[in-house]
Amino acid sequence: TPVKKTLFMDFAIHGFEDEYYRDGQVLVNEANVLIDYFVNHIKELKNYTLVIVPCANPDGVIAGTNNQRACNTAFGRCTANHIDINRDWGSFRAVETRALRDFIKQCKPTFYLNIHGWLNETLGDSNLNAIISKELGLAKKMNNNYPSNYAIGWVHKNLKIPATLVEYKSSSSVSTQK
């Protein structure tokens, strides 16, 4: 029997992205569609275990008010404590960042995808970038680029696995919006 591989995906680490008010909910919806699909088509996973965190920043998605970068009024893109979770992977100030880090470590993934919107690009592992960019029709690939304070940077450095940040083209490009 082949060894199972684990794909770990998290969505909406920013409760707000940059397209419109509370657009992070689109990413949560997309995650839930994937979960529903694979619950009903489990055999398609073959030799994979799929772990999906539909909403890494629930406070930002549900109650956030803006997409400001970390500052004393940032809440939406950032946590209620004004911390951008995807820029917190060195200091781990936010409880959400620590919880996500610990869950990722517990799951022992083989591959990691960090799902965002709406820059039409991938950032990280060149092989994953090629696959994801082709499947989603994304324009830009920033290969082998792992910012140290981003989730993909920490995962790549500490878990030594392929990691990619995926930026959908636009909110209308995800399956739940078509």
Predicted segments with their positions:
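Active-site-adjacent mobile loop/cap segments within catalytic or ligand-binding domains
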Residues: 124, 144-178
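Active-site/substrate-binding loop(s) of hydrolase catalytic cores
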Residues: 4-145, 157, 161
